[in-house]
Amino acid sequence: MQEIGRTARSVAPMAKRILLFGSQARGDAREDSDWDVLVLLDKDRIRLEDIDNVSYPLRELGWEIGEDINTVLYTVDDWAKNSFTPFHKNVEAEAIVL
């Protein structure tokens, strides 16, 4: 988990928050469970290069360590606008800050 956090912070220095969510955060992961990472970027919108620069290095780290790392990117504003959704509520309830 620490390596995922270090990598995420290094490839997304503009991130306001980097959160682990899902089964790994809840502590009920199985051996084959993936790692779900939410990265909140302080930008006006998510661009294709953000996906390339943030999501791909984390996916590559997963390949190196034998884990499946899924990255979800939101702008800070878009995340706040979605605060009513079940996804947002679940992430905020279970998240671990990386």
Residue ranges and their predicted role:
Residues 1-19, 25-31, 41-98:
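Catalytic core of pol beta-like nucleotidyltransferases
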Residues 34:
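Histidine-centered divalent-metal-coordination microenvironment in nucleic-acid enzymes
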